[in-house]
C-alpha cells in the first residue's frame, strides 16, 4: 500500500458525498499512521515551518501484514522516526528537512515495480531511495536506478547478488550481506587453527552464492575444503559422506527448517560432541528449534536427540546492535537508542534490522549534507532541491558522497567498500538450549574478539579439524632385541668355543680325520649367520633412513654368505667321503683340503654373482608401508597409522626366487650326499647322519620361518623374533651336531673313533669291493683311517712278537737238546716269516687283511711255534743240523732277522738301522712288499 501523494500529484478526485466527508478525517489519520514520512514528519513530531523546503526520499518496503516480511518494514518504522526526529532537532540539513515517503512493495515484483514508477511519476523528485527488503524486488529496482540517477540505500537486503557493482552500481546497504560473514568465518577458523573444513549447502541460490564466495575466501588463505556437499530435501546422505571423508568442521548454509533435519541426521551419524564443530547461519528465529517440524525420515530424532546434536554449534550473523558503550553520531549510545526504540514501537513487533534502518537515515542525511557542501563549493550555484532524474552530475555527487560515509552508528562503524557495509559480525553458540554470544568480528579493523570464558566446547579443547593421524613407526621392542641379542651372543660364544676346540685339537686323530679346515668354515658360516641377527633388529628407531637402506643390503649378503659357507663346507666334506667310498674302480685319487676349499669358493662365487647382479640391477631400497588407522589406546582424539620399514625392490619376488632356488638345490645336494654315505661307519670321517639331521631341521625351520615371517610382516616384533629364533636354532643345531659328538668322544674315549674300522657298505658294494680290495687310494682321510687300523694291528702284532720271542727262546733251549731239528726249524721259520711279511697286502683292505692273517694262521698251525708238541715236526730230516755249532750260527743270523723283519710292514724301522747285520729289506723275501704300501705308511 503506497503512502498518499504529496501536493505535487495530479488533480484531486471529485469531492466525496456528504457521508464520506465524515470519514475523511479518520482516513487521513490512518494514512498518517501508516506512512508518516510521506508528509514530511514523524508521528508526534512538530510540523516543520512552511519555509523549510523538503528533501524527498523514496521509501520502498513491505508494510502489509499479509506478507511475511511486512513485519520488517513495520518493525523498523519506529527507528526511522527516531532518526528523522533527531536529525531535525540537530538541524543537520538546515534549511532543509527529510521528507520520507513510504511505498508498499508487498514483496511482489510487479507491485514493487509499480510502486517505484508511481513514485517517480506522481511524486516529487526524490533525491534517494531508502529501503529494499525482499531480494527479488530490490534487485529489479536496483538494476534500473542508474537510468534515473538515483542512489538506493537498503537496510535489510542481504542477498550476495546485489554486491555486483557492474550490475548494481547505485546500490548501497547498511546491513552486511550474507557474504560478509565469510571473512568472519575465516578469522574464526584461523583463531582455532582449523585448516580443514567441509561445506553442507541447501540447493537454494542464496546459500549457493554464499558457499561459492566462501570457497574463494578459504582457497586464498590455504584452508582445505575437503568435501563439498549439497542437498535439496534429505541431508542424511550428504552428512554421511562428510563423515566418511573425516570432516570435523562443517560449514553449513541452510534455513532453519532444514537445520532441524541436518542435526537429526548428524545425531544418527554421531557427528556431534567433542570431535565435531558445526558453524551455521545465525539469523534464524529465536528458539527456532521449537518451531520446526521434524520429518518422518528422522522419526528416531526426538527433541532431546535434536538438542544433543545441536549442542555447541556456532551461529554467524551480523550484529544488529553494537555492544560498545560509545556515543554514536546521534549523541546516544546504542543501548540508549535501544531503550528509546522499545518505548516508541508501542506494540509493534521488533525487527533485527531496526538499527540498520536507523543508521541508514543518518547515512542519507550525512550524504545529502556532503552533497550540499560539494554544490556550495562548486561554481554552479545549483541547489540540491533542484535535482531531477536526468541530472547526472548531481546523481554522481550523491553517489560519491555515499562512498565517503564514515561514522560510528548504533550498529558500529558505518563504512562502505564497493557499496558493501563493513559491519560487525557476531558469533553465538548454542549452550544448554539457548544461544549465547561468544564473540564478534569487526570488518573494518579485521579483528576477532572472543568473549572470555563464554565459548564452550564439549571436550577439554577445541575439536580437531580432522582425525589427527599419528604416524607411528612400528619398531622392534628394545627388551626383545636385547634378549635375542643376548642369545645370539651366547651362540657366538659357543661357536668361538668350538673354533678353539677345533684349532687346539686339529692334530688329534679324531679331529684331523674330520677335516679341521672345513670345520673352521662351518663355524665361520655359523658366526656370520649369528651376526646377521643384530642387523635384522636394527630399524628406524636405532639408525637413520640412509643407514637402514645400507643395512638392507649388508644383512642380506651376510646371511647368504654365512649359509653358503657353513653348508657348503659341510657338503664338501660329505662329497669327499662319497668320492672315496663310491670309487668302484678303486683308482688312486687324491682329494686334498685345497680342492674342498675351491668347491666352497665356487659356491660362494655363485652367491656373489647373484648378489652383485641384484645390487647392480635392482638394489634393495627402504620402503615404508602404511597400514590402516587404529584408535589410540590411551583414548585420545587421535588415530594411529602404523608405519613399517621394509627392504624391498621392484622385482623382489624374482630375486628371492633365484636365491631360494639356489639354496634349495644346495640342500638337496647335501641330502643326496648324506644318503649316499649313510653306511660309512667311521664316526670320525663320516658326518652324514648329522648332516642329514641338520638339513632336515634347517629345511623345516626355514620353510616355517619364511611362511610365518611373511604372514606377520605387519608385526615387526613377531617377525624379528621368528627370524632370529630360526637363525639361532639352525646355526646352533648345525654346530652342535657337527662338534658335540666329537667333543664328547674326545673327552670320554679318544680311541673309540679309531676302533672297529670295518667298512660297511651295502651287499652289492661288498661284493664289488672284495674284488678290488688290492687297490690303494692315497687320500688323506682314507689313509688316516687306515693308519689307525694299521697302528691297532701293529699293537697286536707287537704282542704277538713278544709271544713269538718267548716261543723262540723255548725252541732254542729245546734245540740245544735236539740239534737234528735245527735245519727244519730254520726252514720253517723263514717260511713263516715270508708268510707274515706277505700280509702287508692287507693294508689295501683292513678287513681283508685280517681275514687273510686269520686264515693263514688257521691253515698253518705250525706257525704258532708251539714247543710243547715237537712231535708234529719231522724229526728225522733235521737231526743232523742240531749240532751246537749249527745252532749257534743259526741264532746269530735268525734273531736279528726275526726281531726286525716284521717292523717295516707294521710301521717299525728297518733292521739295518739298528743292527750291523744285513738288512732284511735287502733280502729277496722283502722285495715283494708293495711300494704303495710303503708310501702309504711312511707318508702317514
Swiss-Prot record:
Disulfide bonds join 107-134, 236-265, 264-301. Residues 41-482, 543-550, 618-653, 712-719 are extracellular. The chain crosses the membrane at residues 483-503, 522-542, 551-571, 597-617, 654-674, 691-711, 720-740. It is found in: Cell membrane; Postsynaptic cell membrane; Perikaryon; Cell projection, Dendrite. InterPro entries: ANF_lig-bd_rcpt (IPR001828), GBR2_CC (IPR041689), GPCR3_GABA-B (IPR002455), GPCR_3 (IPR000337), GPCR_3_C (IPR017978), GPCR_3_CS (IPR017979), GPCR_3_GABA_rcpt_B2 (IPR002457), Peripla_BP_I (IPR028082). GO terms for molecular function: G protein-coupled GABA receptor activity; protein heterodimerization activity. Keywords: Cell membrane, Cell projection, Coiled coil, Disulfide bond, G-protein coupled receptor, Glycoprotein, Membrane, Phosphoprotein, Postsynaptic cell membrane, Receptor, Signal, Synapse, Transducer, Transmembrane, Transmembrane helix. PROSITE patterns: G_PROTEIN_RECEP_F3_3, G_PROTEIN_RECEP_F3_4. Residues 772-786 have a biased composition (Polar residues). Its main location: membrane. One of its GO terms (biological process) is synaptic transmission, GABAergic. Glycans are attached at residues 89, 297, 388, 403, 452. Residues 504-521, 572-596, 675-690, 741-940 are cytoplasmic. One of its GO terms (cellular component) is plasma membrane. Belongs to the G-protein coupled receptor 3 family. GABA-B receptor subfamily. Heterodimer of GABBR1 and GABBR2. Homodimers may form, but are inactive. Interacts (via C-terminus) with ATF4 (via leucine zipper domain). Interacts with KCTD8, KCTD12 and KCTD16; this interaction determines the pharmacology and kinetics of the receptor response, the KCTD proteins markedly accelerating the GABA-B response, although to different extents. This is Gamma-aminobutyric acid type B receptor subunit 2.
